[in-house]
Amino acid sequence: MTYTVYEAMPLSQMLARVQKYYPGDGYKLVEKAYLFAQEAHKDQYRKSGEPYFTHPCFVASILVELSLDPPTIAAGLLHDTVEDCEGITLDTIRQEFGEEVAMLVDGVTKLNKLDFADKEEAQAESLRKMILAMGKDIRVILIKLADRLHNMRTLKFQKEERRVAIARETLDIYAPIAHRLGVYAIKQELEDLSLRYIDPVGYENLVQKVGQKRSEREENIRMVIDELSAKLDEQHIHHTIDGRPKHFYSIYRKMVLQNKPFDQIYDLIAIRVLVDSVPDCYAVLGIVHTLWNQMPGRFKDYISVPKANMYQSLHTTVVGGRKMPFPFEVQIRTWEMHRIAEYGIAAHWRYKEGGGAANDLDSKLYWVRQILDWQSDTRDSREFLDTLKTDLFSEEVFLFTPKGDVISMPKGATPLDFAYRIHSAVGNKCVGSKINGRIMPLDTPLETGDRVEIITSASSKGPSADWVRICKTPQAQAKIRAFLKKEYREENIETGRAMVERECRRRGLNPPDVIKPEYYDSILKKYGFTALNDIYSAVGYGGMASVYVVSRMVDEQRTQIGTLKALGYSDGAIA
């Protein structure tokens, strides 16, 4: 990002930037929203002591940096007016700025209104709301990401406990979503800012260690760039090269995951080469490998097989000899790929506005639609949170169908996950799998490059409850549970009843004393159930844990007994 916490765009510069990438009179909408928000927030101040309007102004500046359309920028300027400004309603926004801007403001406002006593449940519902918002209009999430980025930049003005909570939520929810949308410019800053508050000592130590050898490292980078640039000039390849240190959180995460001290983390820098065409990318790759020794297993071709978030680039890690006597990464991509690498889905939005690439944009967001498909079947908030975090954070593997189509899936996915990824009917009728021509168990972890063939049978009775355990992706698990829920309701009820009663007895409780309407009514209301059998069915098909059900009933029992005692009833009367 060009603009820091100390510098937001003045109105004249904001309008000039918008006119440059969005010709026409759209800038007038931005100007009107700017002046409206400035007036609406005129007597309000942030905890930093700054006028409140600095916040929506920064949010809009970030959205302009992403080259987003005028309605999105206007909504960024107005996003807090309905919630925080007396006399301004959604109808006011609709009348002044139109339905599109009002819809975006409403979407952001709804994301701000989540309030749960249970922090984990609140986090799960935050994620659920954000995914639903993505399905309706991805721009709502882009505004929310810009909003969170500026709030993180000014987080030091909050109390310490709140700083840590906000930073953790940012790292768990906002940064992964920015990653999935390919908006690395926001994702990396969110991660570094979060680390500063979650582990301040570790962060400061890391900053200090990275800074200690900065001058030496910068000199090494300069020599490597000069050497590579000279070779590219000889081949008449138009290029731009820059060197940059890896961002702090990526270094920190590598130290934690690999359990290595800072001194044993070598690839701390990346050289980025930007060229005009795809053939030039591969030509540069060849030159890099002639200049320096390639490290085995460290080459990735994201041009021929792009990531799900549209990222394309060639990555290779090499050792630079005397001039750079440690490994460093070289990333090679075109200018267009670089624009998408920095701004992700935001880079595509203006093309959709023109109508030229709407279908392509929609296809890039297939994972959002998948999550929307299965989230409604996931009753338990904690399960939803855990599975979605896995889906957002996980690395990808790239697999081939028998016809040669490429399918990306989370690392650790099995042939059964692959089957359900193709279609629910394929998964439900799956009886076996072949990996690279060999029959393999359905729980085999798949690796990049595997050719996967699913064997089906029309006579298959469908999935069993064990398949939920075999599958690693929440999408496949949700489809299996949906099948079990529909096809085996009576069996699920009996299984669930037995599991709940067994859990009661395990705790030394008499089931009839605990399984009472007044104790399970809160579960019915929370999940939209109508009868106890719905709870049993959910437990039976794996959609809800018996431990959770019994815990909720016991908690409710204790609460009600405590209330009666407070009112003066004796134990005998309560019993």
Per-region residue spans from a language model:
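Short, mixed-charge amphipathic alpha-helical segments
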Residues: 17-33, 89-101
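Short, contiguous pre-domain boundary segments
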Residues: 1-23
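Alpha-helical phosphate/pyrophosphate-handling elements in metalloenzyme active cores
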Residues: 32, 36, 42-76, 81, ...
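Catalytic palm subdomain of template-directed nucleic-acid polymerases
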Residues: 81-89, 216-217, 272-286
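Internal insertion modules embedded within essential enzymes
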Residues: 5-11, 98-101, 107-269, 281-286, ...
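Interfacial "coupling" helices/loops that link adjacent transmembrane helices in transporter permeases
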Residues: 546-575
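Hydrophobic packing positions in regular secondary-structure scaffolds
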Residues: 71-72, 76, 80-83, 94, ...
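Divalent-cation-assisted or electrostatically stabilized phosphate/pyrophosphate-binding catalytic cores
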Residues: 47-58, 94, 103, 162-172
